A protein has these predicted regions:
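Aromatic "clamp/platform" in nucleotide-sugar-dependent glycosyltransferases that forms part
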Residues: 316, 335
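Conserved acidic donor-binding segment of nucleotide-sugar-dependent glycosyltransferases
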Residues: 368-369, 373-380, 388-395
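Nucleotide-activated donor-binding/catalytic signature segment of Leloir-type glycosyltransferases, i.e.
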Residues: 295-315
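A conserved mid-protein helix/loop that constitutes part of the nucleotide-sugar donor-binding site
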Residues: 256-273
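A short, well-ordered alpha-helix in the C-terminal region of glycosyltransferases
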Residues: 382, 389, 396-410, 419-422
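A short, active-site helix/loop in glycosyltransferases that binds the activated sugar's phosphate group
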Residues: 188, 193-221
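C-terminal alpha-helical cap of glycosyltransferases
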Residues: 413-435
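Short hydrophobic beta-strand element within catalytic cores of glycosyltransferases
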Residues: 352-356
Length: 435
């Protein structure tokens, strides 16, 4: 749908009476005299995200949620004990589309969904109805990218459809052992039902081989990269290493233990003994889970540096493109990856890469010795050695940057579309066989 963008601002909010608002950070409290009427919650762009309504006794009774384009998307009604009783999702014109009711039971709360005057006892049932509606006419292909919202339903359709199971992460619980018994729990049900899918798609050739080795090559397995580099990127003039921040490295990822940023810092501490002006910029929101383990490890690693200011933690950013253009080397030291689009994007802008040998994306995206280096899975010393090797030889660094630009053609729109073509050909064969 082509929906006009008309964001709701605080001055557009109408409580039906004249109100006075008092600012409290991203919250604006609405009053009529001394009577508290409601709370307006803004996004970081000063757009209305939701409006909370309160009764004369200070009890929350309704919340209205708004899309960033300016229309209301969801209404919620609350019980006197501050529990959601009813939720209604709206279309762009404000018409109710889906209603969800919560009914207290002895064991908790029961959910009831209503759509098109039909009642469903669970979200799974509602999704099955939705997919059946999509599948009513013609021959259809469904791609499951999020298994928990579709895997069971797409095997229960009233009319056959061509169903593709898409793996966008590691299938096993251990990235170093694809045959380990314990599977990635996000995919477990789908993996136990491998014979029911018409096609299985993974993002790298190695993962496709591992899938066939474990579940049998009788399955129709295809390799399609997760990421695509827009054609316009290949028309941009390359940025030479000499025009970038000197001796600069970059990592953009969720700051979590499994991303190994502490190991990058430890490697940097070693490398700076040879090249003292090396720097590392880290971007990503901090995962404070597991008793803040990620930051504890990072803070310990920072103590190994001769100068802690060599590492800067910037927090999350939405605009990573300029960072890829201003830095020279991109770092990965992860425990598990499914592809790593950020690495692909950095390479498309000429960044040289250093990664540990982690499946599945980085050890496919990085061609060792051409556009970067791959070191052992846990080898911090080797990681540091490659930092020194790259930044000790400007000519090599530039050559690898040139290669990074060239090898990014593997993920152009044209090349990725070619990877999809065998799947569509198999879909056509499925249609003919069914006729």
């Amino acid at each position: 749908l082509d929906i006009p963008t008309n964001p709701m601002r605080i001055q557009d909010v109408d409580f039906g009476v004249d109100v006075e608002t008092k600012e409290d950070g991203l919250h604006h409290m609405a009053y009529v005299g001394e009577h508290f009427l409601g709370r307006i919650v803004l996004s970081s762009e000063d757009i209305v995200a939701r409006i909370e309504y309160f009764d004369p006794y200070g009890n929350l009774y309704q919340v209205s949620h708004y899309d960033s384009r300016g229309f209301e998307t969801l209404k919620q009604w609350y019980s006197p004990d501050n529990q959601i009783e009813v939720e209604v999702w709206l279309d762009v014109n404000g018409k109710p589309v889906i209603e969800k009711t919560y009914t207290p039971t002895r064991s908790g709360r029961m959910e009831t969904w209503k759509v098109h005057n039909r009642t469903f006892k669970s979200l799974d049932e509602l999704r099955l109805y939705f997919y059946n509606q999509l599948n009513m006419e013609g021959d259809n292909m469904f791609l499951i990218d999020r298994t928990n919202v579709a895997e069971w339903q797409l095997l229960q359709l009233d009319k056959p459809a061509y169903v593709v199971f898409v793996l966008h992460n590691h299938q096993a619980s251990d990235a170093t052992n694809p045959d380990i018994e314990l599977l990635n729990d996000n995919y477990e049900w789908s993996l136990f039902n491998m014979d029911n899918w018409d096609a299985i798609v993974s993002s790298t050739p190695q993962q496709t081989r591992d899938i066939k080795n474990r579940w049998g090559d009788h399955h129709k397995c295809f390799t399609v990269p997760v990421g695509v580099i827009p054609e316009i990127q290949f028309q941009v003039d390359p940025i030479p290493m000499s025009a970038r921040k000197h001796h600069s490295m970059l990592a953009t990822a969720r700051v979590a233990p499994e991303k190994g940023m502490d190991k990058m810092i430890k490697a940097l501490a070693i490398a700076r003994k040879t090249i003292p002006d090396l720097t590392l910029d880290l971007y990503g929101y901090v995962d404070h889970g597991n008793d803040d383990l990620a930051m504890k490890r990072i803070n310990e690693a920072l103590k190994e540096l001769d100068d802690p200011s060599a590492v800067t933690l910037h927090g999350h950013t939405k605009d990573v493109g300029p960072l890829h253009e201003s830095h020279q080397v991109y770092l990965i030291f992860s425990q598990m990856e499914g592809f790593n689009i950020a690495l692909m994007e950095g390479q498309s802008k000429g960044m040289v890469s250093i990664t540990n040998d982690v499946s599945y994306g980085p050890n496919e995206l990085v061609k060792d010795g051409l556009n970067g280096y791959i070191v052992g899975y846990e080898d911090v010393e080797a990681f540091a050695e490659k930092m020194v090797e790259l930044f000790s030889d400007d000519e090599k660094l530039q050559t690898m940057s040139d290669n990074a630009y060239d090898l990014s053609n593997r993920y152009s729109e044209h090349e990725v579309w070619k990877a999809w073509e065998p799947i569509f050909a198999d879909f056509e064969a499925w249609i003919e066989a069914k006729a």
